[in-house]
Design a protein with these regions (language model features):
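Acidic, metal-coordinating catalytic cores used for nucleic-acid/nucleotide bond scission
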Residues: 1-10
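Residue-level "edge-of-site" marker
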Residues: 3-4, 92-93, 172
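Short low-complexity, flexible loop/linker segments enriched in glycine and/or proline
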Residues: 13-16, 134
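Residue-level detector of family-conserved "landmark" positions at structurally sensitive sites
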Residues: 1, 88-90, 131, 169
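Common nucleic-acid-contacting/processivity interface regions adjacent to the catalytic cores
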Residues: 96-180
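Alpha-helical scaffolding segments of alpha/beta enzyme cores, especially the outer helices
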Residues: 10-13, 119
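Active-site-proximal helix-loop-helix substrate-binding element of RNase H-like nuclease domains
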Residues: 8, 15-17, 21-114
Length: 180
C-alpha cells in the first residue's frame, strides 16, 4: 500500500546510504535506475524507476477500480471500511522510539500492512482484475492503470481482428496562436 511514495523511496535511500549507487543499480536487470521529483497531494515526493522491474501499488489499484470516494485512503481506514479491521496504533511518541524501544512489536505492526493488503486482495481481487484486463488487451499490466492507452489498444485489437486498418494520425501545424 503506497509503495510508490513510501516503500520504494525508503528502500532506495537506505540502499544508497548503506551500500552506494553501484548496489542501487543492481536492482535493475540493466543496471538502470532513475529518479524524479513530483509535487502531489500538497507535498514533494521523490519517485524511482527501476528499468526492467514493474510493480503494482495496491493503493493505485484501489483508487482506480473502486467507485466510491473515501474520506481517507490510508490503509488503516480502507481496511476498516472494506474488512472491518483496524491496525494497532503506535504506543510511543514516534516511530523511531517504537523502533528502538520495542523492535518486535514494531515488526509486527509493519507485518499488519502486508496481511491487510493480502486480505483486501482476497476480498476484492484487484490484482486479478488488473492482470485479466492486461491479458485480454495484450498490454503490460501497468497500462491498465491509465485510461487512454488501454482503450486505444482495445479498439485497435478489435479492429485488427475484423481486418480493419485504421489510418495513421495526421500531424497538423497550428496556424494561429490564442491567448489563454
Amino acid at each position: 500500500w503506497n509503495t510508490e511514495f513510501f516503500d520504494i523511496p525508503y528502500l532506495f535511500n537506505r540502499i544508497k546510504i548503506l551500500c552506494g549507487d553501484d548496489e542501487l543499480k543492481r536492482l535493475s536487470p540493466w543496471r538502470n535506475v532513475s529518479d524524479k521529483e513530483i509535487y502531489t497531494m500538497g507535498r514533494r515526493h521523490q519517485l524511482y524507476d527501476i528499468q526492467g522491474v514493474a510493480h503494482l501499488d495496491y493503493f493505485d489499484l484501489y483508487r482506480k477500480f473502486t467507485y466510491t470516494a473515501q474520506e481517507s485512503y490510508r490503509l488503516d481506514h480502507i481496511a476498516y471500511v472494506e474488512l472491518g479491521k483496524k491496525k494497532s496504533g503506535n504506543p510511543y511518541e514516534t516511530f523511531k522510539d517504537w523502533y528502538t524501544k520495542d523492535f518486535q512489536s514494531f515488526l509486527e505492526y509493519n507485518i499488519q500492512d502486508v496481511e491487510l493488503v493480502d486480505r483486501l486482495e482476497d476480498k476484492m481481487k484487484l490484482i486479478e482484475l488488473c492482470l485479466t484486463m492486461a491479458y485480454d488487451a495484450k498490454v503490460n499490466f501497468m497500462d491498465v492503470l491509465g485510461s487512454t492507452k488501454y482503450w486505444d489498444i482495445l479498439i485497435y485489437n478489435f479492429l485488427h481482428k475484423k481486418n480493419i486498418v485504421i489510418p495513421q494520425k495526421r500531424k497538423s501545424e497550428k496556424s494561429e496562436k490564442f491567448e489563454g
